[in-house]
Amino acid sequence: MNSVPNDLQTWKRFVKDGVLDEARLRKRIAESWHRCKKAEVNPYLEKGPKVLQQTELDQQSKKHSFFLTTAKPYLEKLLPAIKEMEMMALLIDSDGVVLALDGHPRALYEAKRINFVEGACWTETAVGTNAIGTALHISEPVAIQGSEHYSIASHLWNCSAAPIHHEDGSLAGVIDISCPAAGAHPHMLGIATAIAYAAERELAAKSREKELELISRFGERAASSVPMVLCNTKQHIISASMPIRTSMPDWQGRHLYELKERGYSIENAVTIGDGGTCFYLSEQKKKKAFRFNGVIGQSGRSQAMLMHLERAAATDASVCLSGETGTGKEVAARALHENSERRHGPFVAVNCGAIPSDLIESELFGYAEGAFTGAKRNGYKGAFQKANQGTLFLDEIGEISHSMQVALLRVLQERKITPIGGTKEIPVDIRVIAATHCDLRELAENGKIREDLFYRLHVYPIELPPLRDRTEDIPDLFEYYKQKNHWPGDLPSDFCNVLKQWKWPGNIRELFNVFERLSIRFPDGRLRDESLPALLEAAGLPASSAEKKPAAAGVLTFREQIQKDMMIKALESAKGNVSQAAKISGIPRSTFYKRLKKFNLSAES
């Protein structure tokens, strides 16, 4: 145990000075070190800080018993070879807790010295970069050697870990092979990966067996006229009665919450067998259709945004709308208000970025009579009072000062305001919708927005996609503009294709400006009679806009384009549910996530 890692100096410079020579470190390790530093993990830990008591470990083992009983035999088969190579093998659950370990006595002895034992929590946030915690975080096999570990507790160890997934792509746990650094073996990672793959197949087979047994127990209920479903432990539907099969043909594998979205409520729940639950349902009256006084296109991004708006409108939670200038944040905020229980109350919009800092306080909180020279005789009601029993929309929330953030936080916490110059607190009953063209989380991380205020406002974030990411909606937007302005315009296909290629930095607002120019220039709407250059000139677009916009990150191969198109269709079919989309695509969820990042897609794509 006295080997000295080659890159110890790299580690020392990073933990002491925050300087990292990334050329000397693998990308995955560098990313993990940055995560650890951000999470304030102690790099000088000499042993694992958290080990469960036996009763807690028993509870944890029971919670993950299906994973443990399925994967442990593979660990036991591996042991003779592991012991011969003076290593140890471990099974870790999805929470990062060591459930089982065995191996060579010397390895076990050294492991005990750093609390690397059953019941230890070995996540990145607990002990820094390590094969187990990093594999859990990135959901990929990984090997960590010597001082690549973030905490010194593991600097004299070499570890290789591979994640084990359930059939739906969710993480079941990790298998790890570790040894003192001096006894490293070149095939450690390969062995761990092979065992993880075998355990995954066994988990999938046993899950299917378990589900078949549950379906058998569900029995005649499947032919019943009473709406009911059989769900597994993750509340995915594995069998259903006739009313559900009829109303939801794609019921298999769907999540229980999707039935709630379709108007069903749970009347009763009965346990069936090991891990099965039969939910008896009743169909609720259809709710009023969601009204949106704008236009929602048919693209996946637009439909996903509408779904999130509809969900948020049904609650009274604070909503944070984010999107570039011109994406329609105020229109979305009004839609939330008009479809909520507060729709009969006032909707008050305040642009925090347009009000001088010395006036924002009186604009929001109002002032009492005689509060200052020039004050109105009877005082002034601020936005919070005006919005009482309704909705207050705070646009460009990232522009308010820190002192105003403190005052705003207090109102959000206590639901009371005190006007400037006033002495009495006034209760207010409001819903707050905030909006920003920036990333609010990034503003909080950079200290521009207080973290406590961020968590108050960022309860249900909704991103409004830029027009360049949903150009297939342009024909719908054109039709909306025509109807709203009573203009009989037509949209030539070649001109529409050029509009789809434009980058639209001003988003929908810029697009509508183009439509307005065209309606003024061609009041009869006969755009098809005009040449493409004439239309571009009338629209105020440069002739070069007919050229294709540059690819964001390089040209995709034919195969990659097919993969991307399939993923978009799967996400649309699954309504943004990544696990379901991965299942539809027939690929593991971890791979699906990697491709989301690769193709710059989001769950709302």
Curated annotation (Swiss-Prot):
<comment type="function">
    <text>Acts as a transcriptional activator of the acoABCL operon encoding the acetoin dehydrogenase complex.</text>
</comment>
<dbReference type="GO" id="GO:0045893">
    <property type="term" value="P:positive regulation of DNA-templated transcription"/>
</dbReference>
<dbReference type="InterPro" id="IPR009057">
    <property type="entry name" value="Homeodomain-like_sf"/>
</dbReference>
<dbReference type="GO" id="GO:0005524">
    <property type="term" value="F:ATP binding"/>
</dbReference>
<dbReference type="Pfam" id="PF01590">
    <property type="entry name" value="GAF"/>
</dbReference>
<dbReference type="InterPro" id="IPR027417">
    <property type="entry name" value="P-loop_NTPase"/>
</dbReference>
<dbReference type="Pfam" id="PF00158">
    <property type="entry name" value="Sigma54_activat"/>
</dbReference>
<dbReference type="InterPro" id="IPR029016">
    <property type="entry name" value="GAF-like_dom_sf"/>
</dbReference>
<keyword id="KW-0010">Activator</keyword>
<protein>
    <recommendedName>
        <fullName>Acetoin dehydrogenase operon transcriptional activator AcoR</fullName>
    </recommendedName>
</protein>
<keyword id="KW-0547">Nucleotide-binding</keyword>
<dbReference type="GO" id="GO:0000160">
    <property type="term" value="P:phosphorelay signal transduction system"/>
</dbReference>
<keyword id="KW-0902">Two-component regulatory system</keyword>
<dbReference type="InterPro" id="IPR003018">
    <property type="entry name" value="GAF"/>
</dbReference>
<feature type="domain" description="Sigma-54 factor interaction">
    <location>
        <begin position="295"/>
        <end position="520"/>
    </location>
</feature>
<dbReference type="InterPro" id="IPR025944">
    <property type="entry name" value="Sigma_54_int_dom_CS"/>
</dbReference>
<keyword id="KW-0805">Transcription regulation</keyword>
<dbReference type="Pfam" id="PF02954">
    <property type="entry name" value="HTH_8"/>
</dbReference>
<dbReference type="InterPro" id="IPR002078">
    <property type="entry name" value="Sigma_54_int"/>
</dbReference>
<dbReference type="GO" id="GO:0001216">
    <property type="term" value="F:DNA-binding transcription activator activity"/>
</dbReference>
<keyword id="KW-0804">Transcription</keyword>
<dbReference type="InterPro" id="IPR003593">
    <property type="entry name" value="AAA+_ATPase"/>
</dbReference>
<keyword id="KW-0067">ATP-binding</keyword>
<feature type="binding site">
    <location>
        <begin position="323"/>
        <end position="330"/>
    </location>
    <ligand>
        <name>ATP</name>
    </ligand>
</feature>
<feature type="DNA-binding region" description="H-T-H motif">
    <location>
        <begin position="578"/>
        <end position="597"/>
    </location>
</feature>
<dbReference type="InterPro" id="IPR002197">
    <property type="entry name" value="HTH_Fis"/>
</dbReference>
<feature type="binding site">
    <location>
        <begin position="387"/>
        <end position="396"/>
    </location>
    <ligand>
        <name>ATP</name>
    </ligand>
</feature>
<keyword id="KW-0238">DNA-binding</keyword>
<dbReference type="GO" id="GO:0016887">
    <property type="term" value="F:ATP hydrolysis activity"/>
</dbReference>
<dbReference type="GO" id="GO:0032993">
    <property type="term" value="C:protein-DNA complex"/>
</dbReference>
<dbReference type="GO" id="GO:0000987">
    <property type="term" value="F:cis-regulatory region sequence-specific DNA binding"/>
</dbReference>
